[in-house]
């Protein structure tokens, strides 16, 4: 390789004291980094011969960063390759002379800490004779500090100095002169055979004076001798008496009230406090050995803890409640000592800093006392609520504790420790562990059997009721939330605690279902439906329902009839599908959250569908104020969780809501063990006003026409009417043969209910089969579901070829889409669709065997999950009446009822009873 004849280097100092170096060849072209290392750093030790250089090249120019010592070594030692001709830029030439001087001083070990700079609060290095000045002196100081890391012995010595004499960097303390400074920090050797230290002794009796003793420690043996004047010195030490005098002078200059006539001095309690908390630390920084009482470390690091000793509610009631005010007394604790409020006030009045109480020294901090008094005044003004205790206790149980508890606990009791009574401690243990809950027997009036997890749910609801807390039963769809509530209602009534009715607010589509479930499982309960144009209003409202056990109403009426509903303090207010109040700002949500009830219960398989504020709305109904204001909740949880996915905040929120939210899924082991492999559930739904009007008109017109018909014509008319009534029950557009209608769900309560079911199913990421007899209905459902959920929905019907059907089935089984609509005839037999674990029969087939065959598309060999079957039945219509007949003749169904033809054999009177719309239809 051809050697370079000439290299031009340019060195420039940066603001932080480091330097940059760039180099150019004879053609004034930037020297490549590899060439720069070879020709300039070949003998440069501190960069390990160019290995540890930081590249700070900028556009078009190669440059490296050098520390102060690296630059001194490079320029002052001339570490360049001897085969290179190195030239300097005009700006760099002055640096060569300075670097050479600095290098020579450092190489000779001619440097030491600068005492004058230290006294002004600055640490610097200087040469022994103080020759260097200006820029060279500044560079010298930086270079020495940098050089220390490259010299093992020097680095070890410097670390020892900083550890033994922190004053060198804290600038605390006092030294008599430069020699005292260098000797004190250990830069130069102290020739005396001993070191001088101080020991603080506490008084024998509280209030007496404290004592400081001077002692001498033998450098060789480590033995201690207490100094009692020059006469007490060993003969071999007497030559160093001036060392003791200088130390006494230094102690006095550092702590003006600290002076010695001999080796002992007495100080006041106030001076003892200053010595313990401030002066001793300054002296230690100066390298003085200080011996303090063994208890001081603990007392120094401790603060007095303000405690609220909580008994129970003011009247000692077992019924607590989220907003109940609790009785408490103040206690003050520190170092294992607990003081009453009176004892604490007596201490504060004494204006002392150190007090010996029951053999223990206690620190009294005036600033801390002021802070505690402010806390006490605020807490007493606002009162202690059960919600304050619960939030704190639940947060304390979270792994990792509460580093930012101020953001979580915003009550007046933030920073105050709770000392709970045994009663409250037991209650919180039951809330958090949800174990050992009081056992209640299922009422003999309950006409059914609760599975173990359902009985637990009833006990859990009753436990929260007895404790005064609202509850959210959030079990998976199909696990029996309704019957757990019914068992709860019966127990409350039979325990003699029911003075007013229970109120159930539910979507219109499930009011009929509640009526039937209550009638089936609790026929002894008096159930009233507050619905329809003839419902009681005004002053008649309360009297009308005073003898009812349960009143049912809809979400829509909860706002329309808010005045009437608010006039009663209900025994229980139960919200079914409680996510209906998720928007806290709607009139409906606000109206419901203002209703008064002894116990508030929310039922919801999806208590939070999209936003955390939905959860807040439900909890504000259940336990008002527990999660704070909506604004505060948004700041503490919504923003950190939804914006930043803050795992700690998620954990905190889970801790807060867990005691009041019970959720079991079909995948839970204790639930799965008690579930049948298949659950068939009937969903009872009313007709919309449009459906009811069309239904009644069709029945009237048909019976008017039927009187003139006989035989086959009569049978044909009945079958025609039957089919058209089923279409009306499905959707008015199906009966009216409307094409591409946009207003779908609002005209059919059954379709609204389908949307509710599908929302819950998709929230669990589960799959579903939907069976219908009508192609147009299937197309309507497909259109609506795709628009609602934004995902493809397939429809398997008779218009598809075999290959198309096979492809649909194969993709569904591979879970490429979660929802499959099937026409009953095309998809009811012969298919294996075990990817689904929900089956919805949107309209009924009068032969149960046909429905069962359709259900068995999912419930068959290969199905590894629990299968939930939903049969949708419009109340008061032909669908419900035939369902009742089928149930009552179940034994004969498979043998006799194989088609709809049996209906045509009924008498006209029987047909009128069967087809006429009942009062429960709307």
From Swiss-Prot:
Name of the featured protein: Putative ATP-dependent helicase/translocase YwqA
Similarity annotation: Belongs to the SNF2/RAD54 helicase family.
GO-annotated biological processes: positive regulation of transcription by RNA polymerase II
Pfam (any one): SNF2-rel_dom
Domain Helicase ATP-binding as annotated: residue spans: 462-625
Domain Helicase C-terminal intervals: 753-907
Molecular functions per Gene Ontology: ATP binding; chromatin binding; DNA binding; helicase activity; hydrolase activity; nucleosome array spacer activity
Motif residue range(s): DEAQ box: 576-579
Natural source organism: Bacillus subtilis (strain 168)
Assembly notes: Interacts with the RNA polymerase core.
Gene3D superfamilies reported in the protein's UniProt record: P-loop containing nucleotide triphosphate hydrolases (3.40.50.300), Tandem AAA-ATPase domain (3.40.50.10810)
